[in-house]
Amino acid sequence: MIRIFSLILFVIISNKAIASVKGETLICDKDTRGYNFISKDEVKISGINLNELNTFYINHSYEITENAIFIKQLLTALDKEETSRPIGWIFRRNLDYVSLDYVNDDWSRKFLWSCEATTSEQLNIRIKNKLNELIKVNGKKL
């Protein structure tokens, strides 16, 4: 009886550990995009706008499954739609990210890059360093 109870308790604890990414931070795409999971269903995406050479921060919702983290549409867009389609997903095993793009009335895969775990402080530092590097390179071209 104790073995069965221990097994059930272990399964419950393991399942909760797998199902939570709150507080985790990922940096992707050669330090140009980051994901800070700030709550159980909200992720703050930071990145570099390559056209304007500045940083942006956008809050999205996300859904976690056993194998992937689905990044959903903007939180403000969720108020308008009842069901939210994923705009990308991160594979939990290898931290590869796939982004979807809406082209010609259809969703298609747009990007695929790798992510790595980091801290939110390191995320901000690395994105700012990458932005400064891009500004220097762009300045030399002018």
Regions found by a protein language model. Give the residues of each.
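Short, solvent-exposed loop/hinge segments that bridge or flank secondary-structure elements
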Residues: G23-L53, R85-W89
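Short, solvent-exposed mixed-charge patches
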Residues: L9, G139-L142
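Central antiparallel beta-sheet cores of small beta-barrel/beta-sandwich binding domains
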Residues: D41-K80
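Short, hydrophobic/aromatic-rich segments at coil-to-beta transitions
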Residues: S20-I27, T65-L74, N94-V98
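Sec-dependent N-terminal signal peptides
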Residues: I4-I13
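Sec/Tat signal peptide C-region and signal peptidase I cleavage site
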Residues: N15-A19
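Beta-sheet ligand-binding and adhesion/scaffold domains
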Residues: T32, K72-N138
